[in-house]
């Protein structure tokens, strides 16, 4: 079983069409990985599906980096 961090990075790479090794914890979806607003919405939806959770819009707006996504999932698992 892969870790939450590995799973988040894999989803980010798939959704944004970048190589997994380019996805760093500190990477900003928009500034570093080239995401636009639609990409970020689709990314949040993919995270919700993968981790079987619902991310409210006000929380989703705060998830702007890979680490923020990892932290959110870690805090809301279980």
From Swiss-Prot:
Annotated PROSITE patterns: CARRIER, PHOSPHOPANTETHEINE
SUPFAM superfamilies membership: ACP-like (SSF47336)
GO cellular component, as recorded: cytosol; membrane
Annotated localization: Cytoplasm
GO terms for MF: acyl binding; acyl carrier activity
Keywords: Cytoplasm, Fatty acid biosynthesis, Fatty acid metabolism, Lipid biosynthesis, Lipid metabolism, Phosphopantetheine, Phosphoprotein
Modified residues (O-(pantetheine 4'-phosphoryl)serine): 37
Cited Pfam families: PP-binding
Protein name: Acyl carrier protein
